[in-house]
Design a protein with these regions (language model features):
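Structural signature of extracellular appendage/secretion-system components
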Residues: 1-641
Length: 641
């Protein structure tokens, strides 16, 4: 039979088990408000029974506290991370689209926008000149309204550039945050393994790691996996340590056990710009070990994807075409040195590439992908040619940079391959709205100036342009020579170089009034014939018709004055979608977090009940000790020998 002191050992184990449960409850209560803390519980099991060689076989030996485990459901963690990733993406989009709405807003009293300014120019100002074309005051006022229109677009371009800079800076901030979190998780992995190799559970460290994963999932989409490390000499024996891996961006490893990979932001140089309207210094992201990090991967997710799509979104209107020819061209640089460069001609079929007014290719050079090879290019030219049947064909010829930028020569095997510049991003981000403004100012200025050029001013001289564009450096203005007007071409072939004096050089940022017109309002053409008197204003009627007839000057199927309506519809739709998805995913993430908190969170009422339960258990174990004390007293002191 078991020893008479066997019961004392059972009571002792009961005291230990109840004490462990009480201490765990104390810890839970203390951390009820601690962010990321998971409720813990003492896992107990019956001690191995002892064989006593009696009819009842075995005698129970009490209870053992096996471990203190955290209560956590990884299924809800993963669901939360997925929802949090979408929440992060639309959080960024709704923030920036709200700004965009504010910029395009038109409030005639507090914040005059396009419609107010355009109506003053096209209705009030134009009507005054039509009524009194000989008056210098009315013409000066009209030119002033035109200048207000150019100032509006200058300001809008500046606002969008600021937005692009903010998004770019925030991308860098998020990359630094990823690096910080990944380094901390790698350190935690090491600390967790050090503790768990001894057989204990690193509950608090695991909670800290999960909290960091919550933060990381908002920045980018993540996947995790954890599996035990086994003894190399005995694969069936687990060492107690685990290998924890985090992957982002379509499966690229960010953290592997104790090691973390770091990302770096590299500013694009002037010759690496993608869009004509891009600000300098936009960041590309790479791994510090030299491997590529695709910032445009659709699986990127989170705040990063929202920021990238806002910064670079072009509504899938990037440059693309098919290589039709390669060649050579002699190019003379700024120092007068002539050198032969490779060229590649790319035929385009998309409507937005056929019209140079819609083109957003960088005028500082860039990178072009030909098949699976990437080349730097210095310049490009646009060609429109008509065949014998009068059918037009459109192509772009790129002058490839020399060996200082390219580590390979262009070969003829690229012919027939796909060519592209930049990425096609399925979102209407800042480049899209910049391109929309550029298209409008180019098309409107072109039509407006054409009418003025066909008439005569107060001096009887041929009409001048009203709208111009400033050079970036020397303070001069573009003249927009008709020799580069491909839209007036009916046959043959015309080539427009990116440096030529074409309307492609005009952007919302450099849009301006002809300086000479500001100095002398009488240069404004108002009549169709030089012999007509100063009161003649028939030319201005053509301008009025042009601004109100979408067949004479159309923008996306609307009249010139409906520009804001077209663009604002895009902004409103994107802002509405962003707000809707932001609220939806915020609610979904909150709902999932509530579900997982119901499992892993601390409930004060439940812990209060546990306190009473474990206290009773402790009291009963103490009662066992007291009872056994009385038994031993009778057995040892009062039993006669």
């Amino acid at each position: 039979m078991p020893s008479q002191f066997f019961g004392l050992n059972i009571a002792y184990k009961g005291l230990l088990a109840s004490n462990a449960s009480l201490n765990t409850t104390y810890n839970n209560i203390s951390n009820e408000q601690t962010e990321g803390y998971s409720r813990q519980q003492a896992v107990q099991q019956a001690s191995p029974a002892i064989r006593v060689f009696q009819t009842y076989g075995c005698a129970g030996s009490g209870v053992d506290t096996v471990s203190i485990e955290r209560v956590r459901n990884e299924f809800y963690d993963r669901k939360y991370w997925n929802a949090n990733t979408s929440y992060g993406e639309y959080n960024m989009k709704q923030y920036y689209m709200a700004q965009m709405e504010t910029y395009f807003k038109d409030d005639s009293t507090t914040m005059p926008g396009f419609k107010t300014i355009f109506d003053e120019f096209a209705v009030k100002g134009l009507q005054a000149v039509l009524t009194n074309p000989s008056s210098a005051d009315t013409k000066t006022q009209f030119i002033g309204y035109a200048e207000s229109l150019t100032t509006y677009f200058n300001g809008m371009a500046g606002n969008l550039e600021t937005m692009q800079k903010d998004a770019n800076d925030e991308i860098k901030s998020k990359i630094e945050e990823i690096n910080s979190i990944s380094s901390e998780i790698a350190t935690l992995n090491k600390q967790i393994n050090v503790i768990e190799l001894t057989g204990s559970k690193a509950n608090e460290l695991r909670d800290r790691r999960t909290l960091l994963l919550d933060q990381l999932s908002e920045i980018a989409s993540i996947t995790t996996e954890e599996y035990p490390i086994v003894d190399a000499n005995n694969p069936e024996r687990e060492t107690g340590a685990n290998r924890f891996i985090i992957r982002i961006n379509g499966g690229q490893v960010l953290v592997d056990g104790n090691d973390s990979r770091q990302l770096a932001c590299v500013a694009r140089t002037a010759y690496e710009k993608v869009n004509q309207t891009d600000i300098d210094g936009l960041y590309n992201v790479i791994w510090t070990d030299g491997q590529e990090f695709n910032l445009y991967d659709r699986t990127l997710g989170g705040c990063l994807q929202g920021l990238v799509e806002m910064r670079d979104g072009n509504n899938i209107e990037s440059f693309s075409g098919t290589v039709t020819a390669t060649g050579k061209k002699d190019v003379t640089d700024d120092k007068g040195v002539t050198k032969s460069h490779d060229t590649v001609t790319v035929e385009v079929t998309k409507a937005y590439l056929k019209d140079l007014n819609k083109c957003n290719l960088s005028d500082n050079g860039g990178k072009i992908k030909l098949g699976n090879q990437v080349f730097y290019y210095d310049s490009w030219s646009y060609t429109c040619s008509y065949d014998a049947n009068g059918e037009p064909a459109y192509s772009y010829t790129f002058v490839i940079s020399d060996e200082t930028l390219n580590d390979r020569n262009l070969t003829n095997d690229r012919v027939g391959m796909a060519a592209s510049v930049g990425e096609s991003i399925d979102y209407q981000g800042i480049p899209y709205y910049m391109q929309q403004m550029n298209e409008w100012v180019r098309t409107f200025s072109q039509k407006f100036n054409d009418i003025l050029n066909s008439g005569y001013d107060a001096y009887g001289a041929s009409g001048n342009n009203l709208f111009s564009a400033d050079h970036a450096t020397d303070g001069e203005q573009y003249a927009f020579d008709k020799a580069f007007r491909y839209d007036l071409q009916k046959d043959g072939t015309m080539t427009v170089d990116m440096t030529d004096d074409s309307y492609h050089r005009m952007t919302a940022k450099n849009f301006n009034i002809l300086k000479a017109m500001v100095d002398d309002c009488n240069l404004l053409a108002t009549k169709k014939k030089a012999s007509d008197g100063v009161e003649q204003s028939d030319l201005l009627n053509e301008i009025k018709d042009m601004m109100n007839d979408k067949d004479k000057m159309g923008f996306r199927g609307s009249t010139a004055g409906e520009f804001l309506q077209c663009v604002l519809s895009d902004v409103a739709l994107n802002a509405s979608n962003a707000n809707t998805f932001y609220k939806n995913y915020k609610n979904i993430a909150g709902s999932i977090d509530t579900q997982r908190t119901s499992i892993s969170g601390v409930d004060g009422d439940e812990e209060a009940i546990n306190l009473v339960k474990y206290q009773n258990g402790y009291n009963l174990a103490s009662k066992m000790v007291q009872t056994l004390t009385e038994i031993y007293d009778r057995l040892i002191l009062q039993t006669g020998v």
